[in-house]
Amino acid sequence: MKSEDSTGRMAKGPNGKKQVYDWDAFYKTIQRLQPKAVMAIMGDDVRWVGNERGLGRETEWNATVLTPGIYARSTENNKRLGVFSKAEDLGSRKMLEKATELFWYPSEVDVSIRPGWFYHAEEDAKVKSLKHLSDIYFQSVGYNSVLLLNIPPDRKGLINEADVNRLEEFAAYREQIFADNRVKKGRNYWNAISGSEAVYSLEPGSEINLVMLQEDITKGQRVESFVVEALTDNGWKEVGKGTTIGYKRMLRFPVVKASQLRVKIDECRLTAHINQVAAYYAAPLQEVVQGEDWNNLPRAGWKQVADSPLTIDLGKSVTLASFTYAPSKAEAKPTMAFRYKFFVSMDGKHWKEVPANGEFSNIMHNPLPQTVTFGQKVQARYIKLEATTPTATTAKVGMDEIGVITTP
């Protein structure tokens, strides 16, 4: 179960009216009809990591002090501990000392294979690349999280061929990697304590750039910090380190030729139960660099006339079909635009508002380019964007975050 804004909060419709959900009715219906279904976010099975870009976190505990929202005591408990679903610390020893109960509440990382969560034919060429999907995999599943990859059906109820082809490539790439584990006896069970280490032999002539560690989570999650080293012709070389391991932790690093791996558990809680150490070679992938397909009017001819609201002289009169807001570096910032009004002018003095939806939907959690199509040809030399942040303060938008599509 997943609310429209991924947070479980009362989402707002285009008219700004809050949509109120009867969560208790949802819970009871799910538990009655499908008791084994995973109830995410507002349920108590998995929690949201805090973004919709497919990025997990360096430190991720499955056993957390966070009380799931399904329980009536959640608000009181979480307020007392000063935690919330996206809090950086949900399971450190310091937090455990304050808590009176723990919940097995693993992290879910969600992302769409396309720019948005729903199908649009004009995005058929914008399906995430194999490299992008692979990076997401290693930064979600490889960070002790569950990956929810959204694959939206088209208007016929089918998965588009572009999505299917990419998924097949993605599956084949992972199968190729994990078919060849270079560690000998990597499944020998290791009961580790703080300060202990274990050495594993590799197959002869091994070249590796990926290490996978796993804890036996049926006995809990215990590792707090670790280091991985490889024995090369020049001696032991550190290839990776981290904090938590959990069900699965994967480390990527430049290719090394090695004969052995050494895993050091620097800190853990009592005894950590390591049930697999593996090493692989992942063939490097190159990203296909594409131009800004959301802007076809060179910015070299633009001039920023004002900062707030952002006002731009396009340098000449053009016919606009759409404009796009693309948050810098695809990062969600407190100053980013959420609600907006878009104006055009021929002289920079007399302005006309272009009718539009007025909201960059869900951009706080999925800060990717959002295009607003006008539905009519709009003449303009000057454009102006009046925008407010998700907290209703004045937004700060740079000229490089705006694109326009012109039409004859």
Language-model segments: which ranges?
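Predominantly extracellular/luminal regions of secreted and cell-surface proteins
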Residues: 100, 284-305
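Short surface loop/edge beta-strand patches of beta-sandwich-type extracellular domains
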Residues: 200, 310-312
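Trp- and acidic/polar-enriched beta-sheet ligand-binding modules for extracellular glycan
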Residues: 190-195, 217-284, 305-308, 317, ...
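Extended extracellular/luminal ectodomain segments enriched in beta-structured repeat modules
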Residues: 203-210, 258, 315-324, 379-381
